[in-house]
Amino acid sequence: MCSQRILKLGAKFEGRLESVFLDGALDYVKYNEGRLALEILCEYICEYDVVLSVGEFKEIHELALDMGFELGNAPFKYLQALIKTD
């Protein structure tokens, strides 16, 4: 179930994150490495300063929690700074 959620989330970043990075991160889902896929996707989002909507931020947060990540650790702790504030 988390694998499909990760792929659906990743699709939202098409055109906003270079496809080589997006595809590379999401490719881990094929190998049952969903945790790694989400972590790498979030690292790329942070590294390339991809602007997030509040909804995208919440979706990432919920998914990370469901997968057992500690939200106080990188890369998750840096995502809030990327939320579009207007």
Predicted regions mapped to residue ranges:
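C-terminal-biased regions
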Residues: 1-86
